[in-house]
A protein has these predicted regions:
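Acidic, divalent-metal-binding catalytic cores of TOPRIM
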Residues: 1-129
Length: 129
């Protein structure tokens, strides 16, 4: 008889919504895999987009991090919005650098707000008692 690990696992992925608002076929396939020990948590947009829009505090932190990476970019001097950030993060190299710099910054931040789908994934794996 095969024995299986009963460890819980959570997958966090983008929903990649279609034009009609439904989640993508890929996201639906992931959701269809859910079982008692597997939970799929879907991001409304992308991680960066959702983190930025989560709170004004997040916006300030993320703007500051991106400005430090691209100090010479003029259109980042004001309070740029999520669309501007997402356009700037088009290249995977830029996304990776931004993620690393944001991670470093968050080591010293007192607070940073995360979307509910991330909290749900963490609480599924490690429920608070």
């Amino acid at each position: 008889e095969r024995k299986r690990l009963l460890s819980k696992c959570a997958i966090i992925t983008d929903s990649d919504p279609k034009d009609n608002g439904d989640i993508s076929d890929r996201a639906q396939k992931a959701k269809d895999l859910e079982k008692h020990n597997l939970k799929v948590c879907l991001a409304t947009h992308t991680l960066e987009h959702d983190l930025f829009e989560q709170s004004e505090r997040n916006k300030a932190i993320m703007r500051d991090v991106y400005r430090k990476i691209h100090a010479q970019t003029d259109d980042l001097s004001g309070d740029f919005n999520v669309s501007t950030l997402m356009k700037k993060l088009k290249s995977n190299k830029d996304k990776a650098e931004f993620a690393l710099q944001l991670c470093d910054r968050l080591e010293t931040e007192v607070a940073f707000d995360v979307p509910d789908y991330i909290k749900d994934a963490i609480l599924f794996i490690a429920p608070s008692e």
